[in-house]
Amino acid sequence: MATLCRPAIAVPEHVITMQQTLDLARETHAGHPQRDLVLRLIRNTGVQTRHLVQPIDETLRHPGFEVRNRVYEAEAKARVPDVVRRALAHAETEAAEIDLIVYVSCTGFMMPSLTAWIINTMGFRPETRQLPIAQLGCAAGGAAINRAHDFCRAYPGSNVLIVSCEFCSLCYQPTDIGVGSLLSNGLFGDALSAAVVRGQGGTGMRLERNGSHLVPDTEDWISYAVRDTGFHFLLDKRVPGTMEMLAPVLQDLVDLHGWSVPDMDFFIVHAGGPRILDDLCHFLNLPPEMFRYSRATLTERGNIASSVVFDALARLFDDGGAAEAAQGLIAGFGPGITAEVAVGSWAKHGLPADDVRDLDALELTGGVALSG
């Protein structure tokens, strides 16, 4: 089965703290009639630090969509190779062994996709398939994992490289002064990530089942208005309450797989804001500790769009990984309103869960397998 291996993460060197964000909001929007509400909402995000691809002074300027998109392309080409090389190393594989590259980004536009540049410059085969995903927003991390899983099921033994590049700060619009826009200015950060899904072998989450769900008639809740000045992010005030609708989707996929949510060992979910995590705890009846990796990503990086799930998963790896055969779930949420969900078990060097249990039994009994 396909195994999602350890992700590689990178964040730009320019950092802005919550206090700096609050100070900027006070100064820039001194006369805003709802300034106090905006400041309170920014504090409530819990986002302590964010990373930006440009210094804050440059971020706050708007030189035009053309210039910003040139910055996007230049910075992506400068920074993506590092996470790609590290992800390949984590998965103990090489560029020539990759059969599909999935590239996800909603914060800049290139045609051809960056996948073509990656293939041409980093030693990938010309036959490598390309799958750019540009319009699923924050759900794209989960979607990339699921499409990689689907590909490995369709072509057994294949390997997939996922690359996420999100420079959310390049979408800052100084003329957007609605409460939702000002909140977003204090929530989103920049990051890059990459991970390999191996068709055989590897250590990580063995992908066993995936699913997608679109909440009917919510397509205007999270959206872009594409104007001369670029992408204008629109966020409906109803978005924070979407987990009441999406928690049952997670529950149903776990049930369909024959597992039980209370018995799950780890959850890696898109942390678009603190209420998402709080509501998942409530509606799934889970302790906050189950979402600690996603919470840490939100606190230290902000909402980094499609890279959130990879950053949170990397934190699980940094923590020593899950126990052998541990049951887990990954979920991305984004425009649509869309949920992309995967369930699977932790694999030791790609061993199936039953083989891992047999290996543990051998270790515990000095090499003699226990039988029923």
PLM segments and residue spans:
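Claisen-condensing/thiolase-fold acyl-transfer catalytic domains that form or cleave C-C bonds
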Residues: P81, C106-T107, W117-N120, R125-E127, ...
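Short, well-ordered amphipathic alpha-helical segments that serve as non-catalytic structural scaffolds
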Residues: V53, E75-A91, R147, L192, ...
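Short coil/turn connectors at secondary-structure junctions
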Residues: M1-A2, A95-D99, P126-R129, Y155-V160, ...
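Short beta-strand segments
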Residues: R6-A8, V104, A134, L161-E166, ...
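Active-site-adjacent elements of ketosynthase-type condensing enzymes
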Residues: M110-A116, I162-L183, G211-D228, P274-H282, ...
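Conserved beta-ketoacyl condensing-enzyme motif
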Residues: T45-F124, Q130-Q135, V261-L277
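Condensing-enzyme catalytic core mediating Claisen C-C bond formation in acyl metabolism
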Residues: M1-A74, P174-E244, P248, D252, ...
